[in-house]
Amino acid sequence: MKKNITKTIIASTVIAAGLLTQTNDAKAFFSYEWKGLEIAKNLADQAKKDDERIDKLMKESDKNLTPYKAETVNDLYLIVKKLSQGDVKKAVVRIKDGGPRDYYTFDLTRPLEENRKNIKVVKNGEIDSITWY
């Protein structure tokens, strides 16, 4: 009788440990998936805001018949990305009256690096020309 009780206790301990491990794995997996969904939602929201901002900047310039203007390198990148056609991989943007640092090079196959996003564009930010590669 004592052996049966011991076997039952050991078996129930093993089963409980297995269930506990499975629930922890399930919680970890669910948490991981949830964070992934939150990140994807945040990226989609940010892309939508950026797109609306660039549309507004481009419509203003088209309405006033002035060259496109960008305040930051991120704005410049988004304008170039929106204007790109076909399988363009690189773009070089020249800024009007920018001096020796009047051009910006973008690789359109990858997103813009975080450390370049908030850099101010030289002079008034008017685009003089865009060369596609």
UniProtKB/Swiss-Prot annotation:
<dbReference type="InterPro" id="IPR023253">
    <property type="entry name" value="FLIPR/CHIPS"/>
</dbReference>
<dbReference type="GO" id="GO:0005576">
    <property type="term" value="C:extracellular region"/>
</dbReference>
<keyword id="KW-0843">Virulence</keyword>
<protein>
    <recommendedName>
        <fullName>FPRL1 inhibitory protein</fullName>
    </recommendedName>
</protein>
<dbReference type="InterPro" id="IPR038529">
    <property type="entry name" value="FLIPR/CHIP_sf"/>
</dbReference>
<dbReference type="InterPro" id="IPR023256">
    <property type="entry name" value="FLIPR"/>
</dbReference>
<comment type="similarity">
    <text>Belongs to the CHIPS/FLIPr family.</text>
</comment>
<keyword id="KW-0964">Secreted</keyword>
<dbReference type="Pfam" id="PF16104">
    <property type="entry name" value="FPRL1_inhibitor"/>
</dbReference>
<comment type="function">
    <text>May be involved in countering the first line of host defense mechanisms. Impairs the leukocyte response to FPRL1 agonists by binding directly to host FPRL1.</text>
</comment>
<keyword id="KW-0732">Signal</keyword>
<feature type="signal peptide">
    <location>
        <begin position="1"/>
        <end position="28"/>
    </location>
</feature>
